[in-house]
Amino acid sequence: MIRRPAVAGAFYERDPAALRRRIEWCFEHELGPGTLPAVGSMRRIKGVIAPHAGYMYSGPVAAHAYHELVSDGIPGTLVIICPNHTGMGSGVSLMQQGAWETPLGTVEIDSELAEAIVRESGIIDLDETAHLAEHSCEVHVPFIQYFTDNFRIVPVTMWMQGHETAADVGHAVASAIRETGRDAAVIASTDFTHYSPQDIAEATDRRIIDRITAMDDTGMYGVISELNATMCGYGPVAATIIASRILGATECDLLRYATSGDVTGDRSSVVGYAHLS
């Protein structure tokens, strides 16, 4: 099966040349890293947290994530863990077979790694339907395609985002990466506070990010509950923290935080975006 793009023409440009220009705009934007990265080969990064809104809003912050990832070396496989915004599919859904199409080309699914993740998990289902209309994995793929077509993906979407579920997903991903010997990194797809005034969003997100940089997934859940936070991808973030820790990561840094208000100038109701790795 080839999964067709669901949000081309909405979250990002449908025309390939225009999409490449938009990606360059994201990197060169004043809220972005300022330059396009050179492809490196160190391959130290185990996990990345990046936003998934429309490129005109969160693209510059996402560009920070991909500047660091590309500079470190593009992994052979990216396990992209995202929240389920549509309600379609099962509680945790993985697409195992086929490829994903974007305006920049087609990316194969790493079926062997996908199968290993499902085998290691007690909760992940093989389910294509959860991915068909979901934007929060799709928007990451063109950023890597801009630099290479030599990579594969494993898309995982989480409707169930409780801590036990995230722990299962994180352990399964890390165990499968080790079992298969893959050169892989994990991407957690999330936006932070939704539709609050800028000062409230920043204060709320700061508390959550403090726990993420400490790699304290338990504490992150506590803060989210305490503040009734509207972060949409807390389960993918927790799963990525857990997987990265198992794979040897010992630290996590905040590289960029901004809001939609920093782009549009309207700070009365914003969405928070962050890049951490």
From Swiss-Prot:
Gene3D superfamilies named among the record's database cross-references: LigB-like
Lineage, uppermost ranks: Archaea, Methanobacteriati, Methanobacteriota, Methanomada group, Methanobacteria
Classification via InterPro entries: MEMO1_fam
Biological source species: Methanothermobacter thermautotrophicus (strain ATCC 29096 / DSM 1053 / JCM 10044 / NBRC 100330 / Delta H) (Methanobacterium thermoautotrophicum)
UniProt-recorded name of the protein: MEMO1 family protein MTH_45
The family this protein is said to belong to: Belongs to the MEMO1 family.
